[in-house]
Design a protein with these regions (language model features):
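Non-heme Fe(II)/2-oxoglutarate
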Residues: 1-64, 85
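Catalytic core of non-heme Fe(II) oxygenases with the double-stranded beta-helix
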Residues: 69-139, 143-145, 152-155, 161-165
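Flexible domain-boundary/linker segments
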Residues: 60, 148-151
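Intrinsically disordered, low-complexity sequence elements enriched in Ser/Thr/Gly/Pro
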Residues: 20, 151-152
Length: 166
């Protein structure tokens, strides 16, 4: 049932996107699913710390709605296998993020630094560790280089909206 609702390979939801025309499986999440697993509370705390570092004290944070269905929020799982990659892109919303869910055991330094950001002509390739969450400005150009490993690399990506309370 969840597979038929949420997976780009199996969904019966009309207009289910193939993000950036990558052609690999994407699993979209509903707000209720994120609430049920505790991710909404976790990311609200992280986003508050992120905003505090910019001097933003009074804000309400919520999920950006998906553009293709009212069922989903703008939060999805990417399932990368050998030769999968994500081209340079940016995001919608006010805060974007990536959580590393799974890394292949056979990952080498190339695969462990496959997530790349560019800022002021400087490239940043942070080391990926399972469980690590990266929050960033959605306009920050980033991409994932082609994976060399056969085993799965799984990430959770999301976009948040921030409403400043005055």
């Amino acid at each position: 049932e969840t597979k038929e609702l949420c997976s780009s390979k199996h969904s019966k939801v009309e207009g289910f996107p193939d993000l950036l025309s990558r052609g690999f499986e994407i699993v979209y999440m509903t707000g209720q699913q994120l609430e049920d697993i505790g991710f909404t509370q976790f990311i609200a705390h992280m986003a508050k710390e992120y905003l505090d570092s910019y001097g933003v004290q009074n804000a309400q944070i919520h999920w950006n709605q998906s553009h293709f269905s009212e069922l989903f929020v703008d939060a999805w799982v990417n399932r990368y296998f050998e030769d999968n990659y994500t081209p340079p892109h940016n995001h919608a919303g006010n805060i974007s993020g990536i959580t590393i869910l799974e890394l292949p055991e056979e990952s080498d330094l190339y695969d462990l630094r496959s997530l790349e950001f560019i800022w002021n002509n400087e490239h940043h390739r942070p080391e990926q560790v399972v469980g690590k969450t990266f929050l960033f400005d959605p306009q920050l150009m980033h991409w994932v280089t082609k994976q060399k490993c056969v085993s799965e690399r799984r990430t959770f990506s999301f976009n948040l909206v921030v409403d400043i309370v005055r």
